[in-house]
Amino acid sequence: LLGVWALSWLSVPALVKGPLERIASEQLGRTVTVGSLDFKPWSLELTLRDLSVAGANGAPAQLTIGRVYVDAELQSLLRLAPVVDAFTVENPALRLTHLGQGRYDVDDVIAKLTAPKDEAQTPPSTEPARLALYNLLLQGGRVDFTDNAVGKTHSVQDLLLSVPFISTLSDKKEVRVEPRLAFTLEGSRFDSSAQSTPFAQTRHADAHIRWDDLDLAPYLGYLPASLPIRLKAATLDVDVKLAFEQTPRLAVKLSGQVQTRDVKMTDREGQDLLAFDRLTVDMADVRPLEQVVNLTQVELLKPVLHAQRDAAG
């Protein structure tokens, strides 16, 4: 057994690194490189360092990641589904550029990923993917968004995101992280921390996200040009609780209210299409991993729809 472990420890990095870079490059249409790969067969721990996705047309790297750590479980083999005890991404840096008129420097990657698949392939299943991911952590993240149309760069720094679990299986593992989102945007700090006692004691944790009077107008120009409608004005209010529960069973639940106000939409030619004073959605129990949506109320106030029937009907 020790010999098998030693052979795996020595051979897996060399056997996996090349195919991983090749397959990832083919899927994205960009050159993907991995600085080093380390695998510990006795604990099923995999570490990637210095991962990079090339930029378009010789531009600087689109994405770099300092370290990716995966602590897999033997149950992954027994259950034929990924079961991961810890997943960590350290120091990811993403560079995005708005070229103008709704075009971005990652349009080629998006087109590659969303291209129609072979029709002969089996249709995708409507069932949730089978997986169990625990202790997800992204830290030291950075996003630089350059708008060539106006000559400005917006930066998100010190991005931290921790999620206790994302699971559609019944496995229960030790949870060591609390739900949290924190970042610095243009010098302003945002930090959403857990609103409960430690998860390890109660098997329950809540994260509360709230934004009031968020004017979306400055960001509407960044919507993709391929959209059939144009959003011209909108104000967003969010008051949502995200709950992670491990007893009596695994669950990720959303509740609260999302509201949009003073919304105006046009078609591609700029003709009025839809406007309304307010759309309010009250969520009682939304469980995305279980495809369950329970709403207490959906209210649309003063909608105005502009429609025309052409000669073709």
Explain the meaning of each model-derived region.
Residues 32-35, 124, 176-178, 191-193, ...:
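Short structured motifs
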Residues 232-245, 251, 261:
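Transmembrane beta-barrel wall of Gram-negative outer-membrane proteins
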Residues 50, 141, 159, 172-175, ...:
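Flexible, solvent-exposed coil segments and beta strand-coil junctions
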